[in-house]
Amino acid sequence: LRGQLLLEPSENLDINLSIDYSNRDENCCSSVTIVRGPTAAIIDALAPDSGVAPVADPYARRAWSNRSSAQYIEDNGGSLQIDWNSPWFGGATLTSITALREWSSTNGIDFDYSTADILYRNPEKGDNFTGFETFSQEIRMAGATDNVDWLVGLF
């Protein structure tokens, strides 16, 4: 979901508000066995039925997960850009861009990566295991003369 709103309160001022939101339910990820260590026989004994730890062959692209690998991802953000054609320096444009973004992921992981059900993290919506928030601010002024186009700013 995305939206933008452009306001032009005067011929010298533009204000652009942009927001977005997305969420997805996915299934991701497992790993392949690269090395079968000395505990493989113990893991096999703990596995239900006649489970056997996967063979150490990363090129076979075989992975094992005996629990859900559900993943819930939420991503949203917005920005506000203000452009003002100033009376300074021959009509230079002063621009301010303020932005905020949040991202979070909750995922189920079969941590033992084997046929045994030893270690697992259950994906509960609302439990934020991974995420970030970012804020940014940019201010710049751009203009031109007969011989030079110029730009100065801070981020």
Report the location of each language-model feature.
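Outer-membrane beta-barrel signature, preferentially recognizing the C-terminal barrel domain
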Residues: 65-66, 71-77
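Transmembrane beta-barrel wall of Gram-negative outer-membrane proteins
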Residues: 1-29, 37, 76-80, 131-137, ...
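Extracytoplasmic loops and strand-loop junctions of Gram-negative outer membrane beta-barrel proteins
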Residues: 58-66, 118-125
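Outer-membrane beta-barrel and related beta-rich outer-membrane complex signature
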Residues: 15-63, 99-114, 153
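Short secondary-structure capping/turn segments at boundaries of alpha-helices and beta-strands
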Residues: 68, 79-81, 125
